[in-house]
Amino acid sequence: MFKNLYPIFKSGNILDKKMLEKLRDNPMEIFEILYSDYNNGILKGFDLITKKEEKIIRVTKGIAKIDNKFVWMHEDYEIEMPMIEKDYILKLRMTINIENNKFYERTGEFILEEGSSITDHEIEITRFITREGEELRNDYRNFLDLKRYFNLL
């Protein structure tokens, strides 16, 4: 899980150092201007890297737009590969809360679950079907991989 804070400026709030640091580090208005005409989804990053030996999927840092709000992840995130043969979906869920009436808090959370349903405040990162004894990959090596139905992100 990761969290973004953005200050709320309104009458009566005292401007403090933390608010200025968040404003400097997270220029939200720039995102809103640059990507206002983009649909919800991944804007940059969130690449998938598989580590076969450790059986881990790494999601790289990135920026996403969910419900016309922006959320960014500053560090890579790792998820264990499921061992049970099923259809899986990896999605990013965003929640928006107001903390102490001083900051907007946007929290992003990765969810790996069976099936293929997406609800409000979520975007799909990838879908895959696992098979026991096969390696999970994220690249196409030849034309036969285009027909491959399982273990490919």
Language model segments and positions:
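Beta-strand-rich solenoidal segments
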Residues: 4-9, 56-153
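N-terminal "first-domain core" detector
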Residues: 2-59
